[in-house]
A protein has these predicted regions:
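Short, low-complexity, polybasic intrinsically disordered segments
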Residues: 176-201
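Active-site-adjacent loop/helix surface patches within enzyme catalytic domains
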Residues: 2-166
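Low-complexity, intrinsically disordered regions enriched in charged/polar residues
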Residues: 43, 168, 182-185
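Acidic/histidine-rich, metal-coordinating catalytic segments
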Residues: 163-178
Length: 201
């Protein structure tokens, strides 16, 4: 994954979202925030993230097949983190690049079927039974595709190299009272271990 002088990945489709603030302050961004879309398709996620009325955006969207779409250059502040805090920092949009991954999120089990909040059912092999880091009991989660996990790790490695990213965080870690993405199906701790040598954010 190669990043050009215009702060965009080369060979990646680009659709610019109008939902953006100005450039980052000097020395920033130094953080990546990982999200899932909790939606029905990559196309609908991109539509939402480019809709002025919705007032949300992200720098990148990763489809189920691993295809990447960039919506903002990496030097521009996006609107993905919302009310959030990490250490002494608040409003993490000012510090971070947002990556949205196409995934249905938490699923509910009924008679051996697993259903998303928008009513689609998923086969057992696409479902993980696991405990969220912010919860005490296990529940059901849509698995990420291997292609998605591979490309997200490659994206993070490229952003670390280009921008000196120091923190890779889940939305669930910076807004634990209101967000549960990317959830236990995303191997955040093992990815941080591979990239930084430690599972800790
Ligand atoms: Zn999120």
């Amino acid at each position: 994954m190669e990043i050009g002088p215009n702060h965009r990945f080369k060979d990646v489709s680009y659709i610019e979202s109008p939902n953006q603030s100005g450039p980052f302050a000097p020395e920033l961004p130094d953080t990546i925030v990982i999200h899932y879309t909790a939606g029905a398709s990559t196309e609908s996620a991109i539509r939402t993230l480019c809709d002025r009325k919705r007032k949300v955006s992200a720098h990148l969207v990763v489809g189920r097949d691993g295809a990447v779409t960039q919506l903002l250059p990496f030097n521009i502040v996006g609107w993905h983190a919302g009310r959030s805090a990490w250490g002494e920092r608040t409003s993490l949009n000012r510090y971070s690049i947002g990556i949205e991954i196409d995934n249905a999120g938490q699923l509910s089990e009924r008679d051996g079927c697993y259903e998303s909040w928008f009513g689609r059912t998923y086969p057992a092999e696409e479902v993980l039974h696991g405990t969220h880091r912010n919860h005490s009991e296990a529940s059901y989660w849509h698995r990420y595709a291997d292609e998605q996990l591979e490309v997200v790790e490659a994206i993070c490695a490229a952003l670390i190299q280009r921008y000196g990213i120091q923190y890779i965080l889940g939305h669930e870690e910076i807004a634990p009272s209101r967000k549960i993405d990317p959830g236990p199906a995303f191997p955040l701790d093992s990815m941080r271990t591979r990239l930084y040598g430690s599972p800790l954010a």
